[in-house]
Amino acid sequence: MRGNVGFYGYAAGPTVHIVDYYALADPLLARLPAKTKWRIGHFVRIMPAGYPETIQARSNQIPDSDLATYYDHLHLVTSGPLWSAARLKMIVRMNLGRDEYLVARYVDRLKAAGYQ
């Protein structure tokens, strides 16, 4: 996990997966709200529990059921078989905002736990 992944990611090569906590290159983190203290271009996200393990294991390890479901749907869109019917249906579903409530409930739980 690190920020400013451009040069580092290039130098690390194609076999290294870097979780970008600024969310510039991460589909899940880019859809989560930024922490309250930020500066332009540096919107740090709270790293969801189980997310680094999910990336490493290549299977969903996120304990929050709403965020885990959202991740599964998003992963199908971003990494599923290109022309599969399931992926195309999920693209429509996500573009219509039908899964936004999953992120909203996750964020509500974060706020209730004291995260800002």
PLM feature spans:
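C-terminal luminal/periplasmic domains and tails of membrane-associated envelope-modifying transferases
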Residues: 1-116
